[in-house]
Each structure stands twice: as structure tokens, then as C-alpha cells.
């Protein structure tokens, strides 16, 4: 039986390939749909209507309109770090 961490890794890989399809990368539209489905609260809370465009620009380092798994994982890592920072602050406030 896989551990929770192994399951999390599998979920990230599966999610990327579900939205990337056979081409093996995400286009801006793929990324937008992925963000809407997998992180609906994130996009809803963005004040900037160009949030997906800016994320795509940050992730598409080759400027070819494609986001590979490594760049996708960087996005997930960044979001996780931001959520952890919020969680730590919230837990400290709760402990007071």
C-alpha cells in the first residue's frame, strides 16, 4: 500500500498528464483549465484577471508556449510553500 507521500506524488503526476494529454506538456489553455478545476479558490481570489497569463509567463522559461512537468512541479511547490507559510502563521495565532 502506498504511503501518503507516494500517493501525493502519484496524484501530482496523474493530474499533470490528465491535463497535458499525449503531448506531454501544458499549453496556456491547459494550465487555465487545470487551475480552474484543481485550484478554484486560488483563481477566484486573484484580483488580477491576467493571473494565468502571468503564471504561464513565469513557468514557460523556453518561451515556446509549453509548460513541462518540471515547471508544473515548481508551481505546485511554490503554492505549497505559500500555503505552509499561511498555515504556520495561523497555527501560531491559534496557539496564543
UniProtKB/Swiss-Prot annotation:
Keyword Endoplasmic reticulum carried by entry: no
Per UniProt, location of the Glycyl lysine isopeptide (Lys-Gly) (interchain with G-Cter in SUMO2) cross-link in this chain: 37
Keywords recorded for this protein, A-Z: Acetylation, Isopeptide bond, Ubl conjugation
Modified residues (N6-acetyllysine): 23, 28, 37, 54, 57
Region (Ancestral calcium site): 60-71
Keyword Transmembrane helix appears in the UniProt entry: no
A Gene Ontology cellular-component term: cytoplasm
Classification via InterPro entries: EF-hand-dom_pair, S100-A10, S100/CaBP7/8-like_CS, S100_Ca-bd_sub
GO MF terms, alphabetically ordered: calcium ion binding; calcium-dependent protein binding; transmembrane transporter binding
Gene3D superfamilies listed in its UniProt record: EF-hand (1.10.238.10)
Superkingdom of the source species: Eukaryota
Oligomeric and partner information: Heterotetramer containing 2 light chains of S100A10/p11 and 2 heavy chains of ANXA2/p36. Interacts with SCN10A. Interacts with TASOR.
Reported function: Because S100A10 induces the dimerization of ANXA2/p36, it may function as a regulator of protein phosphorylation in that the ANXA2 monomer is the preferred target (in vitro) of tyrosine-specific kinase.
Miscellaneous: Does not appear to bind calcium. Contains 2 ancestral calcium site related to EF-hand domains that have lost their ability to bind calcium.
PANTHER family reported for this sequence: PROTEIN S100-A10, S100 CALCIUM-BINDING PROTEIN
Protein name (database record): Protein S100-A10
Source organism of this protein record: Sus scrofa
Amino acid at each position: 500500500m502506498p504511503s501518503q507521500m507516494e500517493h501525493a506524488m502519484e496524484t501530482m503526476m496523474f493530474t499533470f498528464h490528465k491535463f497535458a494529454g499525449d503531448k506531454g506538456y501544458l499549453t496556456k489553455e491547459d494550465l487555465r483549465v487545470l487551475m480552474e478545476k484543481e485550484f478554484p479558490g486560488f483563481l477566484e481570489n486573484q484580483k488580477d484577471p491576467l493571473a494565468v497569463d502571468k503564471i504561464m509567463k513565469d513557468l514557460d522559461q523556453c518561451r515556446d508556449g509549453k509548460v513541462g512537468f518540471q515547471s508544473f512541479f515548481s508551481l505546485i511547490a511554490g503554492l505549497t510553500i505559500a500555503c505552509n507559510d499561511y498555515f504556520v502563521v495561523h497555527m501560531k495565532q491559534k496557539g496564543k
